[in-house]
Structure formats: structure tokens, C-alpha cells
């Protein structure tokens, strides 16, 4: 049994003196794990950094075995993100959420396709990568069967003025209909409605992370009796701190 495909490295844990157990994500194969011989060595360790795009080859004698992984580096996203704490936080969050949420050996191409481009753009910096990461989490929720319905208001059916989401149903709510339940609803940032130019700021990023994080926590990680990954919570905390800094200097 074997396959070869472009993959994103999601994790690599030391195993023995020089080997590691790696998790990779590809378009056609989904999330796969395997043993990497010499994966922590000086020569190969840089390849297996979470976030890197690699051309990976998985082999095993039987389909249900752990198997072995080898790879060649395509794009060193991990190294390029090191110079910017926010970019690094985004990268770590993406990798840990993907590994924790995706089922093993099950293809989810819609969740994979945006990731290589997103990871490549990390080196460019800017808040766009945060928005892209939140959009990707919304795609992941949809792929796993928990998609948000942001097309029209759940109460009135109107398609404009959508500024909130019901935490119970995951459906959008307009400002007019939201008034009686404002303290219970989740803010809906405009960039999730394809209006990126209107609110590219830390407050919108915080609201977006809170929104997708709520449903990831309840519907994906919660059903497995696990919390959101620490790297995902750390990204939210970093963005929340940015909003406080901006408020103090306003």
C-alpha cells in the first residue's frame, strides 16, 4: 500500500532517538499518520515542521498499519512564519485545529484546498491571514457537517443587515430581529459575508474567532470530550489583546 501527494505537515512528535511520528493532510487522502525515520535529525528535521508544504510518500505493507512517511520540502511555511508572532500563532492554530478536528484517513478536499495558499501568504503578513484562517475554520465546520447558515436572517428571512449569529442554530440574525436577544447572540463580522474591505481590524478578527471557535468547541471538539487546542486559544487571546491595545490608544 502506498500513495504520494502534496501534503501539509500538521505535527511531528519525537519517537525514539531520531525518529518522529508525523501527521500530514492531503487533498485526496485526508489526515494520515506515519513513522518518519530520522525525522528529528539535523538533515531532515526542518522538513517536518508543522505548517510546511511537502511532497509526501506514505507506504505500508497493509492498509491498516501505521505506515512510514518520507517527504521532500515544497514550501517552508514554518520557517517563514518565525519572524512574526501573529503569523506563527495563525500557523500553529491552523495545524492543531486541522489535526484535532479531521477524522483519520477520510478525504476532505474542500478543507485542504485553501490551506496551501493560506500558508504561503503567511510570509506576507497583515491581518488578511487572520481573516483567511477564520474563513477556513468556517469551511472546516461545513465539511464536517456543522456549517453556519449566513445567507439570510433566521427570523425575518431578510438578506441584509446580518450582524449576529444564533449560538443555538448557527444561523444569521439581522440587527432588527436581534434586539430582544442581543446578550445571547454572537457577533458576525462582515468579512465572513464577503465584505472584507469594511472591517479588517482586530475587533472583527476577535469576533470571527469567537464565532467559529464557539461551534468548533461545541460541535467538533466537544463531541470528542476535548477542549479547543491550546494554540487556537492562544491565537484568540493574542487578538483579544490587540483589541484592548487599540481601545486604549483610541
Curated annotation (Swiss-Prot):
<keyword id="KW-0227">DNA damage</keyword>
<dbReference type="InterPro" id="IPR003717">
    <property type="entry name" value="RecO"/>
</dbReference>
<keyword id="KW-0234">DNA repair</keyword>
<dbReference type="InterPro" id="IPR037278">
    <property type="entry name" value="ARFGAP/RecO"/>
</dbReference>
<dbReference type="InterPro" id="IPR012340">
    <property type="entry name" value="NA-bd_OB-fold"/>
</dbReference>
<dbReference type="InterPro" id="IPR022572">
    <property type="entry name" value="DNA_rep/recomb_RecO_N"/>
</dbReference>
<comment type="function">
    <text>Involved in DNA repair and RecF pathway recombination.</text>
</comment>
<comment type="similarity">
    <text>Belongs to the RecO family.</text>
</comment>
<dbReference type="GO" id="GO:0006302">
    <property type="term" value="P:double-strand break repair"/>
</dbReference>
<protein>
    <recommendedName>
        <fullName>DNA repair protein RecO</fullName>
    </recommendedName>
</protein>
<dbReference type="GO" id="GO:0043590">
    <property type="term" value="C:bacterial nucleoid"/>
</dbReference>
<dbReference type="Pfam" id="PF11967">
    <property type="entry name" value="RecO_N"/>
</dbReference>
<keyword id="KW-0233">DNA recombination</keyword>
<dbReference type="InterPro" id="IPR042242">
    <property type="entry name" value="RecO_C"/>
</dbReference>
<dbReference type="Pfam" id="PF02565">
    <property type="entry name" value="RecO_C"/>
</dbReference>
<dbReference type="GO" id="GO:0006310">
    <property type="term" value="P:DNA recombination"/>
</dbReference>
Amino acid at each position: 500500500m502506498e500513495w504520494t501527494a502534496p501534503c501539509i505537515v500538521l505535527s511531528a512528535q519525537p519517537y525514539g532517538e531520531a525518529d518522529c511520528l508525523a501527521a500530514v493532510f492531503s487533498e485526496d487522502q485526508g489526515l494520515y499518520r506515519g513513522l518518519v525515520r530520522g525525522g528529528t535529525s539535523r538533515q531532515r528535521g526542518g522538513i517536518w515542521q508543522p505548517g510546511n508544504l511537502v511532497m509526501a510518500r506514505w507506504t505500508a505493507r497493509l492498509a491498516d498499519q501505521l505506515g512510514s512517511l518520507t517527504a521532500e520540502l515544497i514550501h517552508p511555511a514554518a520557517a517563514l512564519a518565525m519572524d512574526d508572532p501573529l503569523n506563527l500563532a495563525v500557523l500553529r492554530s491552523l495545524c492543531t485545529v486541522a489535526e484535532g478536528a479531521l477524522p483519520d484517513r477520510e478525504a476532505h478536499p474542500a478543507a485542504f484546498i485553501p490551506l496551501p495558499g493560506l500558508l504561503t501568504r503567511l510570509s506576507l503578513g497583515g491581518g488578511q491571514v487572520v481573516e483567511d484562517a477564520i474563513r477556513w475554520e468556517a469551511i472546516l465546520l461545513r465539511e464536517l457537517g456543522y456549517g453556519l447558515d449566513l445567507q439570510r436572517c433566521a427570523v425575518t428571512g431578510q438578506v441584509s443587515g446580518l450582524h449576529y449569529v444564533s449560538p443555538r442554530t448557527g444561523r444569521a440574525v439581522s440587527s432588527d430581529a436581534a434586539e430582544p436577544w442581543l446578550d445571547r447572540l454572537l457577533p458576525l463580522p462582515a468579512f465572513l459575508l464577503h465584505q472584507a474591505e469594511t472591517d479588517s481590524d482586530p475587533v472583527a478578527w476577535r469576533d470571527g474567532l469567537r464565532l467559529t471557535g464557539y461551534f468548533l468547541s461545541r460541535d467538533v471538539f466537544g463531541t470528542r470530550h476535548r477542549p479547543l487546542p491550546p494554540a487556537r486559544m492562544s491565537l484568540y487571546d493574542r487578538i483579544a489583546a490587540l483589541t484592548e491595545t487599540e481601545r486604549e490608544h483610541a
